[in-house]
């Protein structure tokens, strides 16, 4: 899940992996909101099964990635995962900061919950 500071009305779900030749592949979708996601707390979830990865906001699924049987070289998604929460500045996804960039920025997290079956 990713958001862009200059676009707080859209949340992105993207899978990133390498194809059989080692080239970067990405596949994703997004969910737009009439109000800024930054205006209040939301429940974000990523649920993985042996066949799919689902992205949800406030209980509503907005993207699903198929990883069944390692389709399209997605077998890496069957292995262990880790959670990374961060605020990044710059890069290819959002571009470099400029005079309109607001600093400082913050990410408020109420809780993180992990469970398995």
Language-model regions, residue ranges each:
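GH16 jelly-roll
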Residues: 1-117
């Amino acid at each position: 899940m990713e958001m862009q500071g200059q676009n707080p009305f859209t949340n992105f779900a993207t899978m990133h992996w390498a194809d059989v030749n080692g080239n970067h592949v990405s596949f994703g979708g997004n969910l737009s909101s009439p109000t800024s996601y930054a205006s209040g707390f939301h429940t974000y979830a990523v649920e993985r099964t042996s066949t799919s990865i689902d992205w949800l906001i406030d209980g509503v699924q907005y993207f699903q990635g198929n990883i069944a049987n390692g389709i399209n070289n997605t077998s890496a998604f069957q292995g262990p995962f880790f959670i990374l929460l961060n605020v990044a500045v710059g890069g290819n996804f959002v571009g470099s900061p400029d005079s309109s960039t607001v600093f400082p920025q913050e990410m408020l997290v109420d809780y993180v919950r992990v469970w398995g079956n």
